[in-house]
Amino acid sequence: MKKRISVSVAAVATLSATVLSAPSSTAQDTPKDPADTWPSSNVRTTAPGSVAANKITPAMKREISRVVDTGRRAATRVTPSSSARALAGAQIRCATFESQRYCLRYGWTKRTAADLQRDLVQREARAKVAGHKSGDASILDSLRTHARMAPRAQVRADRAELRQAARATAKVLDLRHDIDGTPYPKGFFARHSEVERPAASASKRRYPKRYYVMNWRHTRQQNRSYWCGPTTMQLIAWGWHGGKKPKTQKTWARRLGTTTSGTSIGQMVRGVNKYTGYDKKRFAGRYIVLDISGYKYGKWLRLHKRHYSKYRAPIVTHPVLKARYFDYMQGWSGSGHFQVGRGYNNRGKNPATIGLFEPYNPRRFNSSAPYVARLQYHRAYQGFLANKAHPQQNIGV
């Protein structure tokens, strides 16, 4: 009798585990957009790729040394237990490469270091008071992690981050020239002969009405509540390398340095550049973290269209995962989050949508929560609001 009871308990446990992760009978992980096919039906001639990584000039080297030296002195004034304001003041420092500003621990921005130090601390403090728990790492988490490093290790990390940023300067200028109309600095092409000069007669680029990248069958749900970063990276790498099975989320969590606090967007971008070929010139070039705080909806949507159809590559989206922005969450909310942006549809009179691989399935962690499918075609304007609602207001492109 005891043996039969133990078998029954085991069977119930197995059934319960299955129910937690199984979809409802009506959920379908299949494309709702007929244009989302694989092999892709996209016209390849509309995808010219990005720009080559530029060389690090002597002026860039001097700027890197200036910012690193400032950090070397500041590192002795803070510890992991220092206040958020003190950590931000010591660690969020900015370099200027060819008139473009890059800030350590954040990304490419038009805001000053002082603005970022104030805005990020205030916005994340409000999010914390509201009881939000992130699946991504907050700026404060990143600052504390950096402060735990030995001083020499901090200097090496800062220098490596700035060198990677400096080599992406040409891409930033190319992107901002297309999106914002930012002019190239005087003498830029003379200093960077490796970068192709755009045609003087080139008109503003028009993008296809719809465009998708990546095999829609290559999806997975995240296995832990704070693994949206590793799962997003898993799917992006699977999209690049192909194969029947992707590397495990545990592998990606280790490679990205994910903790129970989550993964930073800087770690995500470095992962795409290191472990896939989407950073090649014929695709997206070196991925960057871009500040979208000053973007309105039209410019944000153009950024997405440009990336998918020109680069044929995914985007690391960075929204706050709230039901008010994502109706497919059916009232269930998360917080800071990563997804795979993989296309758009702006055809006809219907509102534009963004194609997503959504890693988060609430049913995986709570049997009473709704099932959320991996394939989503989400209203673009709501995605824009979710990105702007995130305390960091940035994206990986």
Model-derived features with residue positions:
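Active-site nucleophile-adjacent alpha helix/oxyanion-hole segment immediately C-terminal to the catalytic cysteine
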Residues: 46, 50, 210-259
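Long amphipathic alpha-helical scaffold segments
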Residues: 143-213
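Conserved active-site-adjacent core of cysteine acyl-enzyme catalytic domains
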Residues: 33-173, 254-397
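Secretory targeting and sorting signals
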Residues: 1-29
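Residue-level detector of alpha-helical secondary structure
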Residues: 14, 235-236, 271
